[in-house]
């Protein structure tokens, strides 16, 4: 076991004392960094970058060379599982992800198999192993997956969507077909995340990007129950340490209590909820991650520091159970120096709350 030089992120997720609030950023390895653009150009395209362990490790570590972040997150994509199921993923210029073989009926669902994490998805595990080696114990490595509901939206819609009409049509007209798909996806996510943990991920996160488009009843039926199944199926101890699990539903602020009741260790918050309210509701059960609006990074350094100070004050003096993050991924045109102001502000301004 490599001894971690900085385990504040893991300790905060387990509500253990830390000397300052740890911070990382969703999409911290990405297009706002010129060095990322150079490495992606070297790879040729996005999926080639994901599938090259050395280059995936390089881009994972790039933000850590610039900023004193408290965790690294695997460089990959949430759509690796549907791609491995044979849906024909490609990234079209200006369109984002497109599946050439989307799910349209029950027969399509029945014919897809569960990908082997050390087979079709071995490139992801190779990247995890390479990143752990290259990190050399500096900070923990976060593994991740999309949630079954979020993966299903892309698989049924055939790509990104604004209205989600195809998947909602399936949900209301053929609910059993959708449940069959979600159940297969939940099993795949369990296998995938457990393989990441065995390969070296020290914490895992499930991104439910599109759970917030559902009614409260449908959220529980079609999204949350499958995330609950995942939490129940995950390896929770590895290499002598607990492996914390974070669930994040974008626009899920009305369901915090239900998310916290799944048995996860932490709940991710987007910027539409006040962190003091979230703490009052679920802070006795789980750690909280979040939740500055990523667009705040367009503001002046003074305004960024002011926002960080306000969120820290909202979480308050308890001193445990908060991982600072953005409420969603960093935007591609944010000046890197503003991200630096953000990270430094979290470290500096949080220290008085941890005495």
Swiss-Prot record:
Subcellular localization: Cytoplasm
PROSITE patterns in UniProt: UROD_1, UROD_2
Pathway in which the depicted protein is active: Porphyrin-containing compound metabolism; protoporphyrin-IX biosynthesis; coproporphyrinogen-III from 5-aminolevulinate: step 4/4
EC number(s) given by UniProt: 4.1.1.37
GO molecular function: uroporphyrinogen decarboxylase activity
A GO cellular component annotation in the UniProt record: cytosol
Pfam families: URO-D (PF01208)
CDD domains per UniProt: URO-D
Site (Transition state stabilizer): 77
Keyword annotations: Cytoplasm, Decarboxylase, Lyase, Porphyrin biosynthesis
Catalytic activity: uroporphyrinogen III + 4 H(+) = coproporphyrinogen III + 4 CO2
Binding-site residues, substrate: 27-31, 46, 77, 154, 209, 328
Keyword Cytoplasm assigned: yes
Enzyme class: lyase
Major localization class: cytoplasm
GO annotation, biological process: protoporphyrinogen IX biosynthetic process from glutamate
NCBIfam families (UniProt xref): hemE
PANTHER family in the record: METHYLTETRAHYDROFOLATE:HOMOCYSTEINE METHYLTRANSFERASE RELATED (PTHR21091), UROPORPHYRINOGEN DECARBOXYLASE (PTHR21091:SF169)
Family that this chain belongs to: Belongs to the uroporphyrinogen decarboxylase family.
Self-association state and partner proteins as the record states: Homodimer.
Function: Catalyzes the decarboxylation of four acetate groups of uroporphyrinogen-III to yield coproporphyrinogen-III.
Protein name per UniProt: Uroporphyrinogen decarboxylase
Species assigned in the record: Vibrio parahaemolyticus serotype O3:K6 (strain RIMD 2210633)
